[in-house]
């Protein structure tokens, strides 16, 4: 029964991790640099399923080490290498999640395939540094027990403690602290909301922003309706009461134009009022007549020179002396980019939560082994661990 279950787990591990590697390498949507961690982690798990678990199963079923002594030493080193690599990979992934959430804009620009590969290489070097000492330093071999040969891990206290700390306890502590920090960041940003960071605080007066002040300037730019309202009132053409009330009720928080932006001059400044605007210069009157022309149908003064304008998507409108000027798509595109970054941050948090659950289960599965393994070095005489539990 045990052999059947373990064999099924071996096949399931190989099949599942192979699908992960194929999905990352073939799917265009999964070719993000951080997914290279998953490829390397899946490769380590496949190595465990093919090179470690079958020999461990044979050793448990037979009750002794059937294979050669040299392969026993290599087998133990590979066991520590692949298992340590899996755990340190999870630690590296948690750090990658933390940097992506806490410093999204700065870290995402640095998250290149070359940088991720360097981190993966560092992970494997750490695992190799922990697994190779038993192959290099044999230590006191002692008399070989009579009977059937056994293949056991290094029993020296210094190696047991150092390998346990480096392979499990230190990465586990790092992952717990990192995910706790990520949880606090996600909780704080959820309370604050996506736009609270750039908004004014209580007691602070709103200052006019320039057009190149980035995505935060979107909230301070006038909308199409507010710009037309300001231009109409400056020309002496006020909006109908119903329209004005509706506009005010729909957008009570729309900011007015900053003083640095030009608006149409007031008709009460000694200028003539006209259908197309007001000016003291005859040339301006001539231009206005040319621009407006004779209306084909009777129209109100407020709409004779201001026909319905189609606002380009992603643009803003600014009232000027010549009418309305559509600003470029730069600000709108910056706003869209800002929202895409916020959506990416939300996905990072969601993926972090799922990954935290997976790592939590992984840690709970590994803790009994490393705890019982460490007890053999701390108190070898009084802390006897049952062989079946180990």
UniProtKB/Swiss-Prot annotation:
Claim: Cell membrane is one of the keywords in the record: yes
User: What is the protein name given in its UniProt record?
Assistant: Alpha-2B adrenergic receptor
Membrane topology qualifier: Multi-pass membrane protein
State the oligomer form and interacting partners: Interacts with RAB26. Interacts with PPP1R9B. Interacts with GGA1, GGA2 and GGA3.
What is one GO cellular-component annotation here? Answer: plasma membrane
Q: Which residues lie on this side of the membrane: Extracellular?
A: 63-72, 141-156, 379-390
The record's comment on protein family reads:
Belongs to the G-protein coupled receptor 1 family. Adrenergic receptor subfamily. ADRA2B sub-subfamily.
Taken from the record's topology, the Cytoplasmic segments are 26-36, 96-117, 181-354
Q: What does this protein do?
A: Alpha-2 adrenergic receptors mediate the catecholamine-induced inhibition of adenylate cyclase through the action of G proteins.
User: What molecular function does GO assign, one term?
Assistant: alpha2-adrenergic receptor activity
**Its Gene Ontology biological processes?**
platelet activation; regulation of smooth muscle contraction; regulation of vasoconstriction
Span-the-membrane segments of this chain are 1-25, 37-62, 73-95, 118-140, 157-180, 355-378
What segments bear the compositional bias annotation Acidic residues? 280-292
Which Cys-Cys disulfides exist here?
Answer: 72-151
Query: Where found, per UniProt?
Result: Cell membrane
**Stretches for region Disordered:** 191-218, 233-311
């Amino acid at each position: 029964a045990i052999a059947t279950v373990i064999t099924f787990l071996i096949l399931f591990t190989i099949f599942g991790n192979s699908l992960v590697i194929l999905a990352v390498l073939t799917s265009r949507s999964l070719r993000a640099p951080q997914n290279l961690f998953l490829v390397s982690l899946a490769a380590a798990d496949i190595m465990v399923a093919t090179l470690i678990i079958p020999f461990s199963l044979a050793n448990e079923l037979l009750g002794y080490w059937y294979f050669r002594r040299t392969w026993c030493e290599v087998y133990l080193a590979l066991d520590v290498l692949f298992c340590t690599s899996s755990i340190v990979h999870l630690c590296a992934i948690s750090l990658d999640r933390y940097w992506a959430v806490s410093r999204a804009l700065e870290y995402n620009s640095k998250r290149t395939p070359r940088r991720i590969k360097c981190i993966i290489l560092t992970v494997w070097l750490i695992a190799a540094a922990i697994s190779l000492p038993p192959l290099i330093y044999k230590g006191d071999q002692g008399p070989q027990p009579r009977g059937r040969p056994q293949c056991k891990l290094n029993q020296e206290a210094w190696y047991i403690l150092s390998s346990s700390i480096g392979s499990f306890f230190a990465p586990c502590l790092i992952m717990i602290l990192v995910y706790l920090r990520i949880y606090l960041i996600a909780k704080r940003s959820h309370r604050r909301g996506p736009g609270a960071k750039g908004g004014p605080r209580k007691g602070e007066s709103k200052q006019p922003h320039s057009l190149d002040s980035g995505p935060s300037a979107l909230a301070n730019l006038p909308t199409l309706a507010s710009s037309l309202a300001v231009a109409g009132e400056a020309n002496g053409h006020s909006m109908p009461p119903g329209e004005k009330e509706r506009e005010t009720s729909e957008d009570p928080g729309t900011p007015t134009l900053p003083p640095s932006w030009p608006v149409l001059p007031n008709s009460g400044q000694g200028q003539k009022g006209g259908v197309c605007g007001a000016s003291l210069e005859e040339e301006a009157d001539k231009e206005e007549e040319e621009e407006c022309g004779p209306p084909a149908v009777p129209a109100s003064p407020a709409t004779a020179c201001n026909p319905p304008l189609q606002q380009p998507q992603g643009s803003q409108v600014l009232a000027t002396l010549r009418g309305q000027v559509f600003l470029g798509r730069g600000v709108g595109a910056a706003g869209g980019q800002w929202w895409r970054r916020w959506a990416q941050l939300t996905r990072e948090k969601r993926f972090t939560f799922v990954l935290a659950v997976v790592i939590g289960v992984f840690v709970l599965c590994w803790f009994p082994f490393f705890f019982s393994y460490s007890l053999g070095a701390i108190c070898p005489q009084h802390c006897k661990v049952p062989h079946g539990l180990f």
